[in-house]
Amino acid sequence: MTIVADVRPDLMPYYKEDCDPKNLAPLWEVLHTFARKTPKSDCQPYIWHYNEIRDTLMKSADLITAEQAERRVLILENPGMRGRYRVTTSLFAGLQLIMPGEIAPAHRHTQAALRFIVEGSGAYTAVDGEKTYMEEGDFVITPSWTWHDHGNESDQPMVWLDGLDVPLVETLDTTFAEPYPEKNQSGTRPSGDSLARYGMGLAPVDYEPQSPNSPIFNYPYARTREALETMRKTEEWDACHGLKLRYVNPDNGKAAMPTIGTFMQLLPKGFETATYQSTDATVFSVVEGSGKSIIGDQTFEWSKRDHFVVPCWVPQRHIANEDAVLFSFSDRPVQQTLGLWRENRGNA
């Protein structure tokens, strides 16, 4: 084999012409895009102020019913990825509206979904035959390939944040979906059954977990808020997060959903977090209070029901004007399982 001492870069265009019809490409021309010192993402910081978008969301009810739309949702589309229907590189987010008396028909799909209740009270989600009635701040899961439908038996509009792993599932080419044979499911278990069975620190004596998903599908905000309020008495505040809890699967202590991590945190009045970075781009929903977040070189003022996104590895700080509670979700469980997740706690 002859070792070439003098390369001929002037011949490279002809070489690439030879590669192209054979579906080949020289790695050396793109290697720098694969091996970077730090992550690069199309995801951009952004905030959706609820008082600016609520009217637009409500107008959708004059144009299409929940049944016609199947899911009447306004996508929270990241400005850096317009037309790609995602809030981060791997996650979808949107605000879903169910008006009084409406039903969003039952279906199932391989994408896992979360519902975080933003406005209203008394609507339900049914998952595999069990209804759960939802209140503001409740966190509800519909695991991959479970039948689910929604209905509003109250006299007021119901709005919740949808979070799904749609882009991740698309990347893996594992998308399947199926409509239920009827408009909605028949109830096979009483409301609250899963919480009673698995959410009280107890489980049926012969119970053997069959799924990586939590057997609980509604985590009521009243219980979460009580936990935060009790824990704040110890005055043990994390410099980067205040007081932050994660929702867990009681079967194994891992995330409630294997592809989406979910969190709730309390920032006391006047608290300013230390600078923090992590590889999981994160979507926040403001449950209580007001404040501001410095994300990269931008400052975003937020209050109740606003939603904002922090991209991967972009420095973030949060400042609470008053006691503030923030719900958030990200793809952290996936990154941790693959050994990819990392954080930088800055000056903490």
Region annotations inferred by a language model:
Residues V127, Y133-S154, W160-D165, I295, ...:
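Conserved metal-binding segment of the jelly-roll/cupin
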Residues M81-F92, M99-L114, G129, N252-G261, ...:
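A short beta-loop-beta micro-motif enriched in histidine and acidic residues
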Residues L267, D280-S290, T299-P311, V325-F327, ...:
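Active/binding-pocket-proximal capping segment
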Residues M1-L11, Y15, E153-P212, F217, ...:
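Double-stranded beta-helix
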Residues M1-T89, Q185-T259, F263:
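A short, N-terminal "cap"/entry segment at the start of jelly-roll beta-barrel domains
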Residues H148-D149, L168-E170, K254, K269, ...:
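Flexible loop/turn segments at secondary-structure boundaries
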Residues G80, L97-E102, T110, V118-S121, ...:
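Short, flexible loop/turn elements at secondary-structure junctions
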Residues M99-E136, P143-T146, G151, Q277-K304:
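A short beta-strand-loop-beta hairpin characteristic of the jelly-roll/cupin
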